[in-house]
Amino acid sequence: MDLKMDRIAVGARFKLSEIGRIRCPDLADKVGVVVAIGHRTTGITVLFDGAQRPTVLHRDYIKTNL
């Protein structure tokens, strides 16, 4: 199991990491909450503040240390 995966928990607040801001510039300034973690994939399901539907992002695209 990846060590970074251990630090990401459901309910954790997050913002995009540096690589996430480069890859997803439209989401660069948004913050949200982790709603699900894929244990078999690299996908993390997140809900951005103000959004109605969740989004799946690669775990390297988010950082939970606000």
Language-model features, listed with the residues they occupy:
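Basic/aromatic-rich interaction segments and small domains that mediate binding to polyanionic partners
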Residues: 3, 7-66
